[in-house]
């Protein structure tokens, strides 16, 4: 409400928001660049991210905890349904817990690979990338981060709060986390052992949280190799309707 009556919605401009009734709003402080600056920043970022690869061999060099925390804080800037931020990042550096996670993951993956729980076509697709049921990087990486999806929120009185688009929101946060790590020179891998319920048990997570993805994090070991891969060209991933 304004001093003279109900608020009026005006056409959206650079500093206006279409519907502000009932909310708490502050001025947007984003920076606008010139077109040449935009092109330069975009190309530099594309070149940086084009070098990103999944790494399974990590150096023994320690990684300062604050670097991983900064990447988590960056991931926490992700958009989410109704701004409910339905994610929990669990940071693991304890060698004993990392070993427990590795053993539990390998037990599940051994069953997947060796006892027909994994479809043959999927096994063929990932085997050519050099994967197996053995996951030594879950111990050798200095840090593990397990990202949990909060399927619903829990209020202070124990009641449930519905979360909207939780899976999509957590997926976006995961992508930003990967980019943040790569930007600072750290490597990671998206690992999704199936099933993943053991992560909830080992990390003592509540029932409203579900494991989403596991990230081993560290510096690539010297001499690390990665599969020779080709990313899709722009005309394979872009459909345009003009503009």
What are these regions (language model features)?
Residues 110-118, 204-227:
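A glycine-rich helix N-cap at a beta->alpha junction
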Residues 74-76, 128-133, 199-201, 224:
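Glycine-rich, charged/polar anion/phosphate-binding loops
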Residues 11, 15-18, 88-170:
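Glycine/small-residue-rich phosphate/adenosyl-binding loop
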Residues 52, 71-76, 145, 151-202:
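Small-aliphatic-rich amphipathic alpha-helix that forms the alpha element of a beta-alpha
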Residues 76-83:
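Glycine-rich phosphate/pyrophosphate-binding beta-alpha loops
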Residues 8-37, 41, 213-243:
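C-terminal helix-cap and adjacent tail motif
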Residues 24-31, 44-60:
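Generic N-terminal amphipathic, Lys/Arg-enriched alpha-helix
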């Amino acid at each position: 409400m304004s001093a003279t009556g109900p608020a009026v919605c005006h056409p959206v401009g650079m500093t206006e928001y279409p519907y502000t009734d009932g909310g708490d709003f502050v001025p947007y402080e984003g920076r606008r660049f010139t077109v040449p600056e935009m092109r330069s920043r975009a190309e530099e970022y594309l070149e940086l991210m084009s070098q990103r690869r999944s790494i399974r061999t990590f150096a023994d060099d320690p990684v300062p905890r604050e670097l991983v925390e900064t990447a988590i804080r960056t991931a926490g800037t992700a958009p989410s349904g109704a701004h409910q931020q339905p994610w929990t990042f669990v940071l693991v550096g304890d060698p004993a817990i990392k070993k427990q996670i590795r053993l539990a993951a390998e037990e599940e993956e051994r069953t997947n690979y060796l006892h027909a729980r994994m479809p043959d076509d999927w096994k063929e697709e990932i085997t050519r990338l050099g994967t197996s049921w053995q996951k030594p990087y879950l111990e050798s990486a200095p840090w593990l981060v397990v990202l949990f999806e909060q399927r619903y929120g829990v209020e202070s009185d124990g009641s449930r709060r519905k979360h909207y688009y939780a899976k999509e929101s957590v997926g976006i946060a995961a992508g930003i986390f990967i980019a943040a790590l790569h930007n600072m020179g750290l490597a990671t891998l998206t690992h999704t052992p199936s099933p993943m319920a053991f992560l909830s048990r080992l990390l003592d997570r509540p029932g409203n949280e579900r494991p989403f993805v596991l990230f081993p994090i560290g510096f690539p070991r010297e001499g690390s190799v990665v599969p020779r891969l080709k990313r899709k060209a722009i005309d394979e991933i872009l459909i345009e309707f003009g503009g």
